[in-house]
Amino acid sequence: MIKIYDTMSRDLREFVPIEDGKIKMYVCGPTVYNYIHVGNARSTVAFDTIRRYFEYRGYKVAYISNFTDVDDKIINRAREEGITPQEVADKYIAAFREDVTALGVKPATRHPRVVEFMADIIRFVEDLIEKGFAYESQGDVYFRVEKSHNYAKLANKTLEDLELGASGRTDEETARKENPVDFALWKSSKPGEISWDSPWGPGRPGWHIECSVMSTEILGDTIDIHGGGADLEFPHHTNEIAQSEAKTGKAFANYWMHNGFVNIDNVKMSKSLGNFITVHDALKTLDGQVLRFFFATQHYRKPINFTEKAVRDAETNLKYLKNTYEQPFTGNVDAQELQNFKDKFVAAMDEDFNAANGITVVFEMAKWINSGNYDASVKQALADMLEIFGIVFVEEVLDAEIEDLIQKRQEARANRDFATADQIRDQLVTQGIKLLDTKDGVRWTRD
């Protein structure tokens, strides 16, 4: 039985899908104006792992993750680079795909772009105006927060708290609002900015409306799971809920999931603070699987501190698992013991996708393997577990020359010519091949 920590209820809840055996899942994707940083990547990796585990447990997952390709940040970047907003979006979508492929992330069922849904967004806003949940003001359209039942319940805030916090605002936009906490559904464009025609004049959608429309148009009014980083709880996901439920009269999502931050020196990694490392740069010195494995060492909801030591530890541990995976079969496998490992792994992951505990089981199983319990069934079980974390080992085939040296060393040992055997072993070490003699034969690892 899978349990999910639901941000809305602040509790672990048994997962019950809307439709047996199927899951509708929407995860907020990147605003494509720059390379993603390691903190952004954690969200992508966390929900890819969750999606993979659902599939491991037999579910068919419709996994949607968008590209926000209409945004002020994209417009500003276009001005800086002297290209169009469309060219900015295309450039960084391509970079995103390259980065997450290196991290072993599966393509989403669909990666929608905002520009594909402009007519749907306008209809959505018109519907909210007709229902009295939104109003036009000088070419902008705002959502009436006070009409939303239990607004900000996701972020555990009250409307009174928000109104108190906004009471001192005097900027031009606030003057156009009925209430300072109302948020934009449609924003009028300035001269020279990218815009679309609408009943309220040329403009572009607000950020929050974009995800609501893409989710409902593709997956329907109510989905099983909506996810994203913890920083999206408020205002983004809060506003998605308000406008979506105002339009449909139905629950927007049955479970809300949020991943923790990546910290640098215990401070949240972010572009605004300037303390970030892009995945593009990290991959110049790190294998993508190492970074992916680093993320798996901590529960997805908890913050994780990005340090060189932590990453190098992940690299060492991953190498150990690769060497374990690539060793020759030994036979003598207790089928019940293998099943016990599988059951223990499922129990760990069923508890809110606790990858850290799941990885612990993998290492316990590796120790068991290295004590002489390895056959094809064990290898497949290990591969299946690791694949949930995006770790796929491509078995290395040794050069014929190296294979020949290993065979000659075996012959020398059989003839008790230990001097020659040692000489060959030392020669292999210089080529990065380390040999280990066991009761089941010789094993090699790439050093």
From Swiss-Prot:
It comes from the Bacteria. It is an enzyme of class 6 (ligase). Belongs to the class-I aminoacyl-tRNA synthetase family. This is Cysteine--tRNA ligase. Its main location: cytoplasm. The gene is cysS. Monomer. CDD domains: CysRS_core. SMART domains: DALR_2. It comes from Streptococcus pneumoniae serotype 4 (strain ATCC BAA-334 / TIGR4). GO terms for biological process: cysteinyl-tRNA aminoacylation. The lineage of its organism: Bacteria, Bacillati, Bacillota, Bacilli, Lactobacillales. Zn(2+) binds at C28, C211, H236, E240. ATP binds at K271. Keywords: Aminoacyl-tRNA synthetase, ATP-binding, Cytoplasm, Ligase, Metal-binding, Nucleotide-binding, Protein biosynthesis, Zinc. The keyword Oxidoreductase does not apply. The keyword Ribonucleoprotein does not apply. GO terms for cellular component: cytosol. A motif ('KMSKS' region) lies at residues 268-272. Pfam families: CysS_C, DALR_2, tRNA-synt_1e. A motif ('HIGH' region) lies at residues 30-40. Its EC number is 6.1.1.16. Gene3D superfamilies: Anticodon-binding domain of a subclass of class I aminoacyl-tRNA synthetases, HUPs.
